[in-house]
């Protein structure tokens, strides 16, 4: 395993188990399970983050609903076929379980990657400046993770001018955001959840 590639993508999460681990898939005879972690924000709101964890880390663990746990890992993506369309699915891949730390930031992510689509700068109805961008982060075995990021204010203006291929270091938190999607032929929009990095620090790398 390339240590440098591990350093490209680092996540620390500490929160409460919202759903019991459910079997997800198997790779080379190793089972992987998925669960949701509920993590508080300073504002009082919460983020619900999907986590993928190996059966090897679950040995001797129960992970009851409401139990607080801490993990270190990586923010990863994969493509899933849904209604004959490829959908980008995001999850935190747990690499290790940690001791709880009341002093720690409960939700922090750091990635080194490349802008892989032209950034989209916009202003909200409340005059907040926002830029959405998609980052490609190299992973072992010639794979890449594609991570949506959202920047604010002066950071939004800065990255809004950058070109595809620019290498950036990004620090922030993983957030879950509900939105409504209008489906063809349906009267009521469908409530969906997006996962992205809310960027607090960005710099050229």
Predicted regions and their residues:
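OB-fold and OB-like single-stranded nucleic-acid-recognition modules
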Residues: 1-205
């Amino acid at each position: 395993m390339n240590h440098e590639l591990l350093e490209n993508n680092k996540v620390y999460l500490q929160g409460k188990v919202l759903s019991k681990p459910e079997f997800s898939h198997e790779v080379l005879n190793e089972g992987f399970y998925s669960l949701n972690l509920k993590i508080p924000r300073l504002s009082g709101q919460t983020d619900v983050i999907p986590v993928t964890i190996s059966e090897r880390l679950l040995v001797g663990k129960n992970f009851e609903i409401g139990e607080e746990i801490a993990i270190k890992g990586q923010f990863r993506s994969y493509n899933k076929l849904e209604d004959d369309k490829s959908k980008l699915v995001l999850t935190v891949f747990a690499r290790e379980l940690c001791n709880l730390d009341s002093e720690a930031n409960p939700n922090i992510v750091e990635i080194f990657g490349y802008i892989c689509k032209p950034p989209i700068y916009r202003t909200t109805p409340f005059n907040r400046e926002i830029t959405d961008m998609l980052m490609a982060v190299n992973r072992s075995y010639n794979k890449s993770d594609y991570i949506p990021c959202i920047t604010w204010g002066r950071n939004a203006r800065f990255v809004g001018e950058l070109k595809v291929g620019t290498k950036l270091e990004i620090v922030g938190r993983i957030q879950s955001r509900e939105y409504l999607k209008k489906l063809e032929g349906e009267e009521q929009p469908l409530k969906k959840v997006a996962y992205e990095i809310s960027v607090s620090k960005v710099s050229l790398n």
